[in-house]
Design a protein with these regions (language model features):
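Nucleotide 5′-phosphate-binding alpha/beta core
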Residues: 1-162, 166-169, 183-184, 188-189, ...
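Alpha-helix N-cap/helix-start capping motif
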Residues: 172-173, 199
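AMP-binding/adenylate-forming catalytic core of the ANL superfamily
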Residues: 168, 266, 274-399, 417
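Flexible loop/turn segments at secondary-structure boundaries
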Residues: 88-92, 175-178, 202-204, 225-226, ...
């Protein structure tokens, strides 16, 4: 018994034998949470109608207990810490804030890639006023553009000088930008710890961040499940994480589905606080699982299932924002068609530089010779927000960060002479894998 990504996102009916069920996105909702505290949009959904996920204080209480274990494992319970995560309407920043309010450890600073809209600002003022009544100071999100990573690096160094340790939670690409700013300004980040999530913590990113003196560890969170796993200081690698098996079960799909020894991960929710009810459900991520005893507080609590090498199968993660490949290609198809180009006249390529920073390249084929590169890119950023809240957020992020470029070149074909919708390359631009029909090959 399992639920595929296509079934969970309602792209395909659930077929078992002669039975077929055409689910709606809300069919997977936890009934007791309907209409509860806050809602977030699922990340990288393949469905045309984005699925919404509800959260309440029961979920935050569960996650707060796990966050306490994580901070205790690293010896940072009393260390000053900050967020560099987007504020509302994005759910990532407010989710982390509310979890930490649950155990009375709000961040000292909240750097946000985007300014809050008026509705979100009103909600944040209410949260601040309520927290103040309990003796807690909650910072407002400070708009901090990608090119202003220097501000975050300087805060880390200053907080470290003041308290001996300093902690930052950020997307992996944002953490890389902080490290690059520190490198250019010769800011020593020894004694600083960064929890990086939202994207794969690749070896290049790890090396680039460590070169500043900082330490970095992976975190794994999904909108549908909440907290999934976090890394302690004693793992095999910074991306080797303890799975929070008290609130969900994880196993891998059959071996014949694996790619490069990494199999799709299947999740089953065990907690009544989870926003979605999952039963061996594929969320589109792959990774490696193994049992490993550990002497850290999380290990002593019985969390001895280790997850490493997590990466997205059918989704793109650029600058911490994850969007389905199908959403990007649907938007580009419309823009290319409007410019008079035929189908398959472009190709997507994800590149990673030596510092671990990722960007998306739209490679235009010979059929689009007369199309202006800048006009096509502007058309893409205008079209993408029409494809759901995740796509709208991605358009804002990627435009501001210059994370997308246009180049010229003929598309590459697979060994079977099929068009590769997406190719992925490493720091030397050598190909690693391609995604065809929404699957890794």
């Amino acid at each position: 018994m399992w639920t595929s990504l296509a079934e969970f996102t309602c792209r395909e009916p659930i077929r078992r034998g002669s039975q077929a069920i055409a689910p709606d996105g809300s069919d997977f909702d936890t009934p007791r949470l309907r209409g509860r505290l806050i809602r977030g949009a699922t990340s990288g959904t393949w469905s045309r109608r984005p699925s919404r996920v509800a959260y309440d204080w029961d979920l935050f209480a569960e996650e707060a207990a796990l966050e306490c274990l994580l901070f205790e494992s690293h010896g940072i319970l009393d260390a000053p810490w900050a967020l560099w995560l987007p504020g509302p309407p994005s759910v990532s920043g407010i989710h982390n804030l509310l979890v930490h309010l649950r155990f009375r450890r709000p961040p000292e600073r909240w750097f946000s890639h985007l300014p809050a809209d008026w509705q979100s600002a009103a909600a944040l003022r209410y949260i601040r006023a309520t927290a103040r009544g309990f003796g807690m100071r909650v910072p407002l999100p400070e708009p901090t553009a990608f090119e202003e990573a220097e501000s975050v690096a300087r805060w880390l160094a200053s907080a470290r000088d003041r308290a001996g340790r300093a902690v930052l939670k950020a997307f992996a690409s944002s953490a890389t930008r902080v490290a690059e700013a520190a490198r250019q300004l010769r800011i020593d980040l020894r004694g600083c710890l960064i929890f990086a999530g939202g994207e794969s913590l690749t070896p290049a990113r790890i090396a680039h961040i460590r070169a500043t003196g900082a330490t970095v560890f992976a975190r794994y969170v999904a909108t549908e499940t909440g907290w999934i796993a976090s890394a302690c200081p004693f793992g095999d690698s910074p991306d080797a994480m303890h799975v929070f098996t008290d609130r969900l079960a994880v196993l891998t799909a059959p071996a014949d589905s694996a790619v490069d020894d990494d199999a799709p991960l299947l999740f089953t929710t065990l907690s009544a606080g989870a926003g979605k009810i999952l039963l061996n459900t594929d969320l589109g991520d792959s990774g490696r699982l193994r049992r490993r005893p550990c002497g850290c507080p999380m290990g002593h609590a019985g969390l001895n299932l280790q997850l490493s090498g997590v990466h997205s199968q059918a989704k793109l993660s650029i600058e911490g924002i994850t969007v389905a490949v199908a959403v990007i290609t649907r938007a580009l198809d419309r823009v290319v068609a409007a410019a008079g180009g035929p189908p398959d006249s472009y190709q997507l390529r994800q590149e990673e530089d030596g510092a671990g920073a990722r960007r998306l390249v739209v490679r235009l084929g010979p059929a689009l010779t007369g199309v202006d590169d800048g006009a096509l890119l502007r058309g893409f950023f205008a079209e993408l927000p029409r494809h759901g809240p995740d796509a709208k957020l991605a358009a804002r992020f990627w435009r501001e960060s210059s994370a997308i470029a246009v180049r010229r070149g003929s598309p590459t074909l697979s060994d079977a002479h099929k068009m590769r919708p997406l190719t992925v390359s490493g720091p030397d631009h050598s190909p690693r894998f391609d995604v065809a029909r929404g699957r890794l090959r």
